[in-house]
Amino acid sequence: MDNLKVLFEENLFSDLQLIVEDSNESIVLNVHRNILYFSCDFFKKLLIGQFSETNDKSIKIIVHNAKITSCVIKNFYGIDDKLPEYPDWMYYLETYRCYDYFGMKIPVDKLLELTVPSEGFELLLQIVDLLDYCDELGHLIIRNLPLDYDINDLSKDFVTDLQRLSNEYQIICTKHHTIKIFNNKLYKPIKTIHHSENITSLCYDNNNKRIIYGDLKGTIYAYDFFSNKIIFNLQNIQTNKTLPNNVIHLAIINDKLISVYFDGKITVRNSLDGTLCYVIKLIENPFLFKVCPHTNCIFHFNTHGFTNVWSIDTGNLIHKLSQFTNTMFNTLKNDLIIFWRENNLILCNYPSMDEIGTLCKEYSFPPLVLLNKQHILVGCHNGLMDIWNLKKLTLVKSTQLFDVPIISMTYSPNGDQLIVANCDREVRILNSDNYEIIYTKNINKDNNNKLLTISLHDAEKIEKLNIL
């Protein structure tokens, strides 16, 4: 390609003057017929077809954008001629429009990586309309949909399909050195992330659409879900050489990335770029902790009967509680906590810790709360799932899901489905309105018990599409 570049830049042996013209300007290029002929169907037909220009020394073509078209033609010679006055999204969309005009293949994988501002959304729709439509292109449209865009400008069938896509979610699980991503029908993995070390922790950053995972060496990786690239990685600075330094827990709360290490350290970072905000050094067992999105706090349970509570925003110690001393609890809202005492679930106010009531049944797994349904769900050793009324603290229903222990429960991003896994890695999807089983799937017995569901799109855009 370097030789071709020299031919163009030094105007060697050119045999055609090509005039590229749009409504604003004309650009003259000295080119070579054989180079154009072998580069795309448009010039192949123009140069040997039944056209009056076939033998002309000068040919004019009328295009939508002369500058972009000139860049595309220069690229036939291996010249990558970017236009600094064009933002990336506009440069690539205009380039892809030129590709279509020339009969060239539009690189869909590159198109799917684009983030387009509201002023470019109509152009994006035009480019997508040139392609064979697929779900990936529909997701691209939803991701770039301006919140002030009039949905009525789109066809009814197209909006219906976007609604379908907006309500899809994906399920993530880990297996030793890999992260497997399934669609919500749990067919074969649609994506697999391979890693050199055992993956020890996992969470999803919905704000930035990234999978965050940590490994045995204490390194944290931020993996962009749509571009399939590592955005950054963070090395752990080991403070205790006698202990392993692997990451045992990760969480995203608002714009903060919280990571807990085996060596007794909690770091809080900016989730966008990994910039360190502060470090909390735990005096004893780092496994006795809880990172809580409802209270925006970190709880640490020590062996002296106290629970320290830090603000995630400031890193300051804001409470010291003595009511409970184990991690088997969930915060239901910013003022409500459920925790274990003698195998019973106790509901209490936070931070006063005044008890509201007791769920009198032996449980050993953290409960799952569906606030929109006002239900508390608890999985049992015998495969039974109990559903409690959050306000009345009465048992609504018990349903036998499996014959073996339930190890994890989560729900879909919009709350309409419940995903429950047992120790044999059999997963069942339930309707969260009536708790009836929709379907069952096995996703490999040697996956660990980390199960996440992720929404592919922002809640505001999902609501906008489904409000019609």
Curated annotation (Swiss-Prot):
Pfam families per record: BTB (PF00651), WD40 (PF00400)
SUPFAM superfamilies in the cross-refs: POZ domain, WD40 repeat-like
Residue ranges annotated for the BTB domain, each copy included: 14-85
MF GO annotations: RNA binding
WD repeats: 194-233, 354-398, 401-440
Keywords for the protein's UniProt record, in alphabetical order: Repeat, WD repeat
CDD domains cross-referenced by the UniProt entry: BTB_POZ_ZBTB_KLHL-like
Family as reported in the entry's similarity comment: Belongs to the mimivirus BTB/WD family.
PANTHER family referenced in this protein's UniProt entry, alphabetically: U5 SMALL NUCLEAR RIBONUCLEOPROTEIN 40 KDA PROTEIN
Protein name per the record: Putative BTB/POZ domain and WD-repeat protein R154
Species for this entry: Acanthamoeba polyphaga mimivirus (APMV)
Lineage, highest ranks first: Viruses, Varidnaviria, Bamfordvirae, Nucleocytoviricota, Megaviricetes
